Amino acid sequence: MPFFDPSARFTRSICNRGGVMSFKIAIIGAGSVGFTKKLFTDLLCVPEFRDIEVALTDISQHNLDMIRAILDKIVEANGFPVKVTAHTDRRRALEGAKYIISCVRVGGLEAYADDIRIPLKYGIDQCVGDTICAGGILYGQRNIPVILDFCKDIREVAAPGAKFLNYANPMAMNTWAAIEYGKVDTVGLCHGVQHGAEQIAEILGAKSLADLDYICSGINHQTWFIDLRLNGRKIGKEELVAAFEAHPVFSQQEKLRIDVLKRFGVYSTESNGHLSEYLPWYRKRPEEIARWIDMSDWIHGETGGYLRHSTETRNWFETEFPQFLASAAKPIDPAKRSNEHASHILEALETGRVYRGHFNVKNNGVISNLPADAIIESPGFVDRFGINMVSGITLPEACAATCMASINVQRMSVHAAVTGDIDLLKLAVLHDPLVGAVATPEEVWQMVDEMVVAQAGWLPQYADAVPAAKERLATSTVKTRDWAGAARRNVRSIEELRAEKMALKKAV
């Protein structure tokens, strides 16, 4: 990682009364209301950050108005001098910003529905579809041109040396594009490691998460607990398998992850549903999908589960907004600060308090048996000198092989997104592990044509390729199917959601 001159940081962060700092943070895609609220309250848990400026930007004025109202309520309730602004003009929001956080979803739920729906016609059943597989690759094609626009704005109007914190999926592809082509100081952030650690602490009976020490390494959504210790005692494969299989809930919800643990010898940080679509073995036939997933919650493998969840969440928030707004008028409780990395990284960079986490960066030798150009997720420490990665890590061979399959897909996908090369895009999809386990080359070629045509409005780099794709689709002989997937659930109505929430309250 690059060495940062600490004096440059001090000149840009003005210290006011009592050590309180004044600098600007911009949040792109701030219309992701729940996540933006969490980031904001986390930031205000840092005592020195209560005089900062937070500039929100989104293409939706409606969403901006909602999140601005919520954040204003928080500021008012706590009496902090924080300044909150909202802009549909992104460059205005980024002007002078020292830190830029992105949580965008280009195309929204409309395009996301195509990421799930169209591959199902070719037998490809995804739970999430936001990392690789057919849906994740097309998601990256939509996001990367916009990410590069963000980077251009950062270079031109943000503070000199501004840092870009990317939360948006597909994490590795977006971060790869920002570093390689956007030429901006970028780190990718995800919470998968933290969630996996919480599970392990629970099954091992740890009194506190602090009793658990671990090293996770790999790539985003395919990171592995390669060293695990409880109160200094090393935890091996057999003990971990036995603990998971004895747990009444995780033994059912994480069947696939437990099977991978048995075979690979290490536990994956990612959820059962996520992991199932990065591997070629568990979602290739309907009966296999039913065998390995759990329907108690979308994240355990439901077909299109995250799309359903996201749709219900959006509808619920729109309907219940007055209640969300009223609940925002509460004092900040630092004890409830989340484990999302962003606020902890900024605190370490600005105050020098050291923070340890797992970050997505360009490899450059951090993991010895993965390519130097890949975006890896691995441990690092943050202080005033920047993000400093722990180097010299070697993954178990099976983990490295699985990561390599995804890295090759990611590299082709990024290059295709930047160049608008539809043939390279098709090759990227063809080499995806799950796609390759299910679909023939002819099916992949037609599926990509269909997805590019359906999403043409969000894919400007493929404008010249769309007419020919339409012509091929008009004369195609590849058969498709009308299939909802192996484990699909309908989107619940507001009334159904309200009834379920009431029932849960009564049951407590």
What are these regions (language model features)?
Residues 3-20:
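Short, Lys/Arg-enriched N-terminal segments with co-localized hydrophobic residues
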Residues 25-54:
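N-terminal Rossmann-like dinucleotide-binding module
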Residues 48-72:
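NAD(P)-binding Rossmann-fold cofactor-contacting core
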Residues 72-76, 156, 176-186, 202-206, ...:
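Short, surface-exposed basic-aromatic patches at helix termini and helix-loop junctions that form
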Residues 83-96:
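Short acidic low-complexity segments
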Residues 110-181:
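Rossmann-fold NAD(P)-binding glycine/threonine-rich loop
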Residues 150-231:
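Internal, well-ordered domain-core segments that constitute the primary functional module
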Residues 205-505:
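Long, compositionally biased stretches enriched for glycine and/or charged residues
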